A protein has these predicted regions:
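N-terminal accessory segment detector
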Residues: 1-95, 102-121, 131-175
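Metal/cofactor- and membrane transport-associated sequence elements
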Residues: 125
Length: 175
C-alpha cells in the first residue's frame, strides 16, 4: 500500500488477507477436505448469483460457450485487477492462465493452502459454467495448479461431442 492507495483498495486488501487467513485457519483447524467443501459452496453460490448476469453485461452472450467462459474470466477478473490471459484455440476450446504472482494466494500463504481449496473453487465455479449455460457438453480441463507447485493456474474450457457426467465437468491433465 502506498500513500496514494484509495480507501476502497485498502479495504479490498484487508478483505483479501482475511479470506486467506480464514482458508488457512479452516484447513488447519478442520482439515483440508472441509476447506475444499467450504470453497466449493462459497464459489458455487457466487457463481449462481453472478455468472449468467455477468456474461450478459460483458457482452459475451453470442459467443461460443467455451470462448465466452474464457473471456469471462479475463474480463471479470481484470475489473478487480487480477491478471488473466486468454487464448482461443477453436470455437470449442479456449484457454485461461492466471499470471504470477497469483492474486488468490499471494505471498507465503500459497505454502499453507491445501490443493483441496483450489479444487473446491474450481468445482464450484469452473465446473458449473456448462450447467449454468445449459450446455451439458461444456467442461474445464486444468493443466496446471500453483498449489501443486506447477507453473500456475492454467487450463481450458472445452465443449465435447457428448454430454458430460457431473464428475467429468472438471478434469485434471497436467501432462
Amino acid at each position: 500500500m502506498t500513500s496514494t492507495t484509495s480507501p476502497i483498495e485498502v479495504q479490498a486488501h484487508l478483505h483479501h488477507q482475511y479470506f486467506l487467513g480464514l482458508q488457512l485457519m479452516v484447513s488447519v483447524e478442520e482439515g483440508k477436505e472441509v476447506v475444499g467443501e467450504w470453497m466449493f459452496r462459497l464459489f458455487r453460490r457466487q457463481h449462481e448469483e453472478k455468472f449468467l448476469s455477468s456474461v450478459g453485461k460483458l457482452g459475451l452472450d453470442d459467443l461460443p460457450h467455451a470462448v465466452a467462459c474464457a473471456k469471462y474470466h479475463v474480463l471479470s477478473n481484470g475489473v478487480g485487477g487480477v491478471r488473466v490471459e486468454y487464448m482461443e484455440e477453436t470455437d470449442t476450446k479456449a484457454w485461461v492462465r492466471f499470471r504470477y504472482p497469483r492474486w488468490m494466494y499471494d505471498g507465503p500463504a500459497i505454502c499453507g493452502i491445501p490443493v483441496e481449496a483450489s479444487r473446491g473453487f474450481m468445482k464450484g465455479w469452473y465446473a458449473q459454467n456448462g450447467v449454468s449455460l445449459k450446455n451439458p457438453r461444456l467442461g474445464f480441463v486444468c493443466v496446471s495448479e500453483d498449489l501443486t507447485v506447477q507453473f500456475g493456474f492454467c487450463g481450458y474450457f472445452k465443449e465435447y461431442d457428448h454430454d458430460l457426467a457431473p464428475e467429468e465437468r472438471l478434469q485434471f491433465a497436467p501432462d
